[in-house]
Amino acid sequence: MAETSSLISGVAQRCAGSLFELALDANSVASVEKDLGRFEALLSGSEDLRRLISSPVFSSEDQLHAIGAIADKAGIKGLVGNFLRVVAQNRRLFALPGIIAAFRQIAAEHRGEISADVVSAHELTSAQQNELKATLKGVAGKDVTINVTVDPSILGGLIVKMGSRQIDTSLRTKLSSLKLALKEVG
């Protein structure tokens, strides 16, 4: 499984790097990032679309036509629309979530930012997000872009992943640590 994950990661990095170079040449990094975000929202909202990109059962022609129709309907044209079609034609749709994440990371590095993945038990308000960004900026010494994911199973607190560092202040982790400590005592 680790080999498959690194393979996807390698494909994602190469594809994202190529897309970034094209976007940089066209002076459209921000619009490409926005279009990728719109496609990612479609992806997260549709089980059928996730199945289409991950299943080897669909032919490349079927994937190409479906992705083209979805991109057109969503108004994703130009560089990202063409890129999605090429990825579908080359049977690399399975790597799209990784490509989008890698593109964001490359674009953030180009802007001198660092990206942080934040998991919280509930939606963070704008004020909470701004306070978190300011705190993380103090730690990292760079502007920080946060990608917030809601996971009610952590019960409370936050899990922040920034580069190779992870800060886990979730209630779930604290309860697990307490449970382990009580087992050692008893």
Curated annotation (Swiss-Prot):
Which terms in the Gene Ontology molecular function aspect does this entry carry?
Answer: proton-transporting ATP synthase activity, rotational mechanism
Which keywords does this chain's UniProt record carry?
ATP synthesis, Cell inner membrane, Cell membrane, CF(1), Hydrogen ion transport, Ion transport, Membrane, Transport
Q: Respond yes or no to whether keyword Ribonucleoprotein is given for this record.
A: no
Protein localization: Cell inner membrane
UniProt keyword Chloroplast, yes or no? no
Subunit info?
F-type ATPases have 2 components, F(1) - the catalytic core - and F(0) - the membrane proton channel. F(1) has five subunits: alpha(3), beta(3), gamma(1), delta(1), epsilon(1). F(0) has three main subunits: a(1), b(2) and c(10-14). The alpha and beta chains form an alternating ring which encloses part of the gamma chain. F(1) is attached to F(0) by a central stalk formed by the gamma and epsilon chains, while a peripheral stalk is formed by the delta and b chains.
Give the HAMAP family listed for this entry: ATP_synth_delta_bact
Which family, according to UniProt?
A: Belongs to the ATPase delta chain family.
Q: What is the designated name of this protein? A: ATP synthase subunit delta
The species this protein belongs to is Brucella melitensis biotype 2 (strain ATCC 23457)
